[in-house]
Structure formats: C-alpha cells, structure tokens
C-alpha cells in the first residue's frame, strides 16, 4: 500500500497539495454497519477524496438511542478496501481511553494502512453521556488534564523507547511499545474543539493540526470567513509562541459544501487563501445524519477542488 504523511512527516509517497479534502461521517446509524462504512471508504477513494474521518462516540445523545459501532473496527474495514486515502477519527475523546490501548490501536492501523492514519483528539461531547454514563468524572478540568497527559504519553510510547512517566492522571512504569507507527515521528494528531473557545486551539497548536467546530457547522451553512481568519491568526500566533512557526501544521475547516463544481470552488478558494489545509465535508445535523445514501451521493460528486 502507498504510504502517506502530512507535511514534514516521514513516509514515502506523500504528494504536496494546497488543500486536501476529507469526508466526515458518524459511527452511528447506517454507518454502524462495517460493510456500509467500508463501501463509503471505497467510494470516497474512487471519487478523489483525500481522507475519510469517523466520529468516536460510545453513547452520544442518549434520547436518540443510536446504533453505534466501534470506530476502530470501522476503520479496519475501511483499511482493507482502500490503498490511498487517509483514515482517522474526528474526534477520539482521549480522556476516556487508556493510553496503552489507544497507542496499540492507532499503531496497528497505521501499519495496516501503510502509514495513512490520523488521530483526531479532544475532550469529546456530550460529556455527561460519554463520560458520566459509565461513572467517570465529568469535571472538564480533570478531563482536560487527562487529555493533555494522554497525548503526551501516546507520543512517548510511539517513540519505541523506554517510557517512565508520572503525571497527576496517568502513570507509566518502564514500558517499551513496539512496533512503532509507520509515520515518524508519530501518527499526526489533530486536536478538536469549539471555536472561539481558545483553550482547545492552544492545545491544538502544540500538535500537528486543528480540527475545530465553527459556527453553523450543524446547519449546513458555509463557514464564516471572518471567523476562519480569526482562528487562523490565533493558531499561527500560538505556534509562534511555542517556537513551532516553521513546523508543518494542518488547519481543518468543515461544513457542507454547496452543489456544483463552481460553487464548491467559490467556497474552497477563499478558505485556501486564508491558510486552511483541509476542507472536511460534513452532513448537517438532521434526519439524514445517520443515513448512508445522502453522503454517498455527495461523495460521488467529488470534492470541491479549487
């Protein structure tokens, strides 16, 4: 399988492009069937999309009683029917996962795909459903600390070197995790959060990309260019403060693109001018969110390339 990596990551076969295009689907509803998710992946690759991202819920909105699948099994099904597109989560609530298990899962998939994995990471939502339903804390300060420590431990484990770590939330005692991911120095980590909340975007600026939720994403409207410009400026400032201004970094903006190539280009072009590196195609919140047919129809139309 060809090996893909983000800018600055080591993995043969990656090609440069101004903007790349992903499809973003939930892990519930019709997508909870692995064969359906695999078909979505196969068609997305055939239609020229660059990545397929899946949500990572265990409960979600409790009153909706969704059928929900494990995202890692879904991604495995997708890996077996694709050879080019990147695969990842958007997003995995790292604070509710054991770093040892998550590190193994992501590494195994990165090796299975020949280096095509992306880990989208964040707190996740709704906190009450995703954490409180199983007796876990819903204190967001504690969860944020667990998230930060979890990401740090993942990075250490993926090095393949002996790891000993003592944090407030996580402890690791003399562990070596091998094999390591194909992508070096690690599988790229994109951090999510709701903009204009600045804390999650400060966190994102310390890693490899930001995949924020911006205003109007759930209604099918295009992103507000002023809002995106403010976000890009903020992220670049944080990168500079961290001494990372010259390092590769992805900015992923999502929404529902308008139909037709010309309209799609009119959407993607101004966003590219602002500095985004990925457009993430998302279905608006509603009755069609968990249905495969609408997203397959959109996939077949191809990405809104500039």
Put a short name on every predicted segment.
Residues 2-306:
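Active-site-adjacent structural elements that line small-molecule/cofactor binding pockets in enzymes
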């Amino acid at each position: 399988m060809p090996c893909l990596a983000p800018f600055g990551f080591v993995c043969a076969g990656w090609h440069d492009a101004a903007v790349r295009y992903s499809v973003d689907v939930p892990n519930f509803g019709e997508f909870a069937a692995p064969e359906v998710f695999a078909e979505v992946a196969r068609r997305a690759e055939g239609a020229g999309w660059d990545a397929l991202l899946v949500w990572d819920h265990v409960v979600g909105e409790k009153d909706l009683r969704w059928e929900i699948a494990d995202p890692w099994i879904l991604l495995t099904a997708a890996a077996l029917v694709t050879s080019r597109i990147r695969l990842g989560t958007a997003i995995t609530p790292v604070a509710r996962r054991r770093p040892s298990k998550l590190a193994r899962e992501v590494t195994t998939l990165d090796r299975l795909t020949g280096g095509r994995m992306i880990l989208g990471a964040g707190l996740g939502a709704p906190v009450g459903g995703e954490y409180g339903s199983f007796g876990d804390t819903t204190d967001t300060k504690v969860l944020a600390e667990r998230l930060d420590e979890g990401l740090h431990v993942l990075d250490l484990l993926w090095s393949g070197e002996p790891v000993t770590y003592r944090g407030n939330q996580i402890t690791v005692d003399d562990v070596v995790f091998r094999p390591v991911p194909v992508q070096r120095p690690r599988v790229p980590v994109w951090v999510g959060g709701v903009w204009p909340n600045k804390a999650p975007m400060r966190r994102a600026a310390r890693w490899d990309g930001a995949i924020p939720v911006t205003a109007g994403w759930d209604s099918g409207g295009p992103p507000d260019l002023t809002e995106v410009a403010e976000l890009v400026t903020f992220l670049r400032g944080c990168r500079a403060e961290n001494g990372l201004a010259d390092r590769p970094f992805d900015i992923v903006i999502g929404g529902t693109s308008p139909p037709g190539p010309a309209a799609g280009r009119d959407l993607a072009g101004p966003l590219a001018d602002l500095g985004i590196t990925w457009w993430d195609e998302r279905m608006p919140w509603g009755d069609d969110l968990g249905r495969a047919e609408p997203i397959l129809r959109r996939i077949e139309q191809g990405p809104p390339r500039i």
